[in-house]
Amino acid sequence: MATSSGSCLIISLLVVVVAAALSASTASAQLSSTFYDTSCPSAMSTISSGVNSAVAQQARVGASLLRLHFHDCFIQGCDASILLNDTSGEQTQPPNLTLNPRAFDVVNSIKAQVEAACPGVVSCADILAVAARDGVVALGGPSWTVLLGRRDSTGSFPSQTSDLPPPTSSLQALLAAYSKKNLDATDMVALSGAHTIGQAQCSSFNGHIYNDTNINAAFATSLKANCPMSGGSSLAPLDTMTPTVFGNDYYKNLLSQKGLLHSDQELFNNGSTDSTVSNFASSSAAFTSAFTAAMVKMGNLGPLTGTSGQIRLTCWKLNSS
């Protein structure tokens, strides 16, 4: 009897897993790069213009938009839940406290412009996905086809911010966090290459520069000048070579033990991803190809489609019922 019950339980669990996978696959299949071609033909150019203007004023915004999209997708899927100004929501959780406020402002501003042209048509989730792509392009990086048709969540998911891997993560923890989202080791290393642009706060890397041994000594010393052992909010570039230009220098830094975050250097620390880092460091084309493919995969995580969710009229709050 115990064996029979166990078999039934296993079968039931398999049915649930398969059903969930099919549901996610079906939702992704409903996305299309031409989704707004008829309903809001000016949407893509409006987003691009808004991002280019913002990046021209502050280059860091390009990286901030990319990070915002990543944080959105890793929490319950790419549904703009991260944009909600809920006093107890995702924005209040530790992993999101260092998100650049300017990125939220840019998305909200673009949304207002899109709403003026096409009321109630383009979702905040899609605007953020496209803005992340355009931010990379504005900093000299590659473009990729963003599939569209996501809808916006009707709630925030603060408890699921634990899905975001912290900067203190080991390689094993990183691989597990990405695997949970059906992203493999190559995807993980490629998406980490987003750190070729942007900055991090001292509190995110103080442990690495004071406690770790797998860091270039001179590099660590230079960082300590503006980052005390106790931490703080002072900023340092994630890529010391070309901090405002998207490229593969991030991986070259890792080969020299100049990864800013503990989790960065874990990618090249006598582990299973060393060869991938070396490949990306030596071939910009290999990195670009892997990065764009991984961005498409990440952008398709758990989208709300059809009649699920809503098209928010303002990104930071839910529509009035």
From Swiss-Prot:
Residues annotated to bind heme b: H195
Reported cofactor(s): heme b; Ca(2+)
Residues with PTM Pyrrolidone carboxylic acid: Q30
Enzyme Commission number(s) from the entry: 1.11.1.7
Binding site for Ca(2+) 2: T196, D239, T242, G247
Site (Transition state stabilizer): R67
Catalytic EC class: oxidoreductase
Record has Heme as a keyword: yes
Pfam families reported for this sequence: peroxidase
Signal peptide: 1-29
Sequence similarity: Belongs to the peroxidase family. Classical plant (class III) peroxidase subfamily.
Protein name: Peroxidase 42
